[in-house]
């Protein structure tokens, strides 16, 4: 009896809250936030750029007139602080909305950072909901992006490390150069098209696809739980290591000193440019690899799946 009373009271309370909110909306008591674009011209010299934002898309673009300018959509209770101290440009979102404000639909807004120079010391961004896009015109000493919900598209290069992490969203890089490359996605896709990396590459995808087309590096390590791996036109100076729980692994014109692939469920197929001696194991699948006994070690194991590897020149006699 007591349990039934509690359930009934909860239902009535929820219904009353919905009626109250609906009355505010229909009666004009809750007006949608009106956004307008505000600009922040920067005259101080800047070497480092730091962003801490949420519910806004970020674009890093070359300045059309040689000035450093921040343009952002703002409302009465959502605005930004833009400061420069010791050569660091800091942009932060200030969210002063009430809980009632947050019940209203608020579409992601856009922020554009126009940079006059092509070279800067560092770019770091902590984003919560929103996409990040960095144009190809820039080179940083380091790039460090952490995005909770949203994608990251980076075409800029770094003399040091590029590190990008996304909880839910895709990461895309094209024609970049860096000393090191770290890309981490919990749920999403990693796509790299054209990358020259001096040292190591670390690619982690918990759930999602990994697609690389055109990469040179010293070493390549990729781990993940679920998702297909496709590597095309890859040149690894030393070790290539891939580990997956579920998902196919496909090579197209891949070269390395040594290759190691471990997957629980999935096929491992494709063409390798280098000569290898093969060590293979599959519980319920077929194995077809070149009968070679020289070159580097290529170890491929899968519990459920086929292993089919050919030399790259076999498709182009």
Predicted feature residues:
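Short linear S-[DN]-x-LW-Φ motif typified by the pepsin-like aspartic protease active-site region
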Residues: 26-94, 104-126, 131-146, 151-157, ...
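Positively charged n-region of N-terminal signal peptides that target proteins for export
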Residues: 1-4
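Hydrophobic membrane-insertion alpha-helices, especially the h-region
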Residues: 6-24
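Short, surface-exposed interaction patches in beta-rich subdomains
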Residues: 155-156, 162, 171-317
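Short hydrophobic/aromatic-rich motifs at helix boundaries and adjacent loops
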Residues: 20, 94-96
């Amino acid at each position: 009896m007591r349990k039934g009373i509690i359930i009934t009271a909860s239902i009535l309370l929820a219904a009353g809250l919905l009626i109250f909110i609906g009355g505010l909306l229909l009666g004009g008591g809750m007006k949608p936030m009106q956004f307008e674009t505000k600009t922040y011209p920067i005259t101080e010299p800047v070497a480092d750029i730091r962003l801490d934002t949420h519910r806004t898309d970020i674009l890093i673009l070359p300045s059309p007139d040689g000035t450093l300018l921040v343009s952002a959509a703002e409302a009465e209770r959502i605005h930004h602080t833009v400061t420069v101290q010791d050569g660091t440009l800091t942009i932060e979102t200030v969210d002063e909305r009430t809980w009632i404000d947050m019940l209203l639909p608020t579409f992601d807004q856009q922020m554009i950072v126009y940079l006059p120079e092509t070279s800067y010391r560092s770019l770091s961004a902590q984003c919560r909901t929103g996409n990040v896009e960095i144009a190809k015109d820039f080179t940083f000493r380091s790039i460090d992006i952490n995005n909770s919900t949203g994608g990251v598209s980076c075409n800029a290069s770094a003399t040091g490390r590029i590190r990008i992490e996304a909880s839910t969203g895709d990461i895309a890089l094209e024609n970049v150069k860096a000393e090191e490359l770290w890309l981490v996605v919990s749920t999403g896709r990693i796509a790299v098209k054209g990358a020259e990396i001096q040292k190591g590459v670390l690619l982690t995808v918990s759930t999602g696809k990994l697609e690389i087309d055109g990469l040179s590096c010293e070493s390549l390590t990729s781990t993940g739980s679920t998702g297909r791996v496709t590597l095309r036109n890859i040149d690894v100076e030393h070790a290539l290591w891939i580990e997956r729980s579920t998902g196919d692994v496909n090579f197209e014109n891949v070269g390395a000193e040594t290759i190691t692939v471990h997957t629980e469920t999935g096929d491992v197929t494709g063409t390798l440019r280098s000569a290898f001696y093969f060590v293979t194991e599959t519980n319920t699948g077929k194995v077809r690899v070149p009968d070679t006994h020289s070159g580097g070690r290529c170890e491929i194991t899968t519990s459920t799946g086929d292993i089919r590897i050919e030399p790259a020149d076999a498709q182009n006699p």
